[in-house]
C-alpha cells in the first residue's frame, strides 16, 4: 500500500531534471553568500584601494549587518560616510530608520576601515577586505580564511 502512495506522489523525471538544472544555475549566486572560501571558489576577486575609490565611493550600497538589519551607506571621497539602518542601538533589526554617520580610511594592508555612529552609539573602527563577485561587493574580516563570514553590499540603482 505504501508503494502505491509513493508512486502517486512521485515527481516526474523531466521535472526533477529541470529542478536540478535550475539549482545548478543558481548555485554560484547562493554560494557567494556563505563564507569567503565559497565566495573565492565562485570567482570573486579582492578589490584594491584604487578600485574601491573608483567603483564604490559616491555610490549608495545596501546590505545586511551581522545582526541581520538592513544598512544603506554612501562613502564620500572626503573620508566620511552617511546612511541609514533599520537597527536599534544594540544593532538588532528594528522598524525605525536610524541615521548612520561615520568616517572611513584605507590602512596599509589595503583594508577599508570604518567607524560608524548609529543614533547615539559609536562603533569603533573595523577594518575589512572588500571583494567583488559579478555586480555585488562583499566585506570580510579576513583576506584568505575560507571560513570567514562575508556580507553582501549591493550598489543601489
Question: Predicted segments — roles?
Answer:
Residues 13:
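Segments that shape or occlude catalytic/ligand-binding pockets
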Residues 16-28:
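Bacterial N-terminal signal peptides
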Residues 2-10, 30-103, 109-157:
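Lipid interaction determinants
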Amino acid at each position: 500500500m505504501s508503494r502505491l502512495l509513493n508512486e502517486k506522489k512521485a515527481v516526474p523525471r523531466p521535472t526533477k531534471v529541470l529542478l536540478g538544472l535550475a539549482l545548478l544555475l543558481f548555485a554560484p549566486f547562493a554560494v557567494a553568500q556563505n563564507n569567503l572560501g565559497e565566495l573565492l571558489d565562485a570567482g570573486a576577486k579582492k578589490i584594491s584601494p584604487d578600485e574601491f575609490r573608483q567603483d564604490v565611493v559616491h555610490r549608495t550600497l545596501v546590505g545586511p549587518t551581522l545582526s541581520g538589519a538592513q544598512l544603506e551607506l554612501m562613502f564620500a571621497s572626503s573620508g566620511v560616510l552617511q546612511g541609514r539602518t533599520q537597527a536599534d542601538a544594540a544593532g538588532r533589526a528594528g522598524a525605525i530608520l536610524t541615521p548612520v554617520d561615520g568616517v572611513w580610511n584605507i590602512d596599509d594592508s589595503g583594508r577599508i576601515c570604518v567607524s560608524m555612529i548609529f543614533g547615539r552609539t559609536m562603533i569603533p573602527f573595523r577594518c575589512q577586505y572588500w571583494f567583488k563577485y559579478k555586480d555585488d561587493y562583499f566585506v570580510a574580516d579576513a583576506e584568505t580564511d575560507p571560513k570567514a563570514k562575508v556580507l553582501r553590499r549591493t550598489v543601489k540603482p
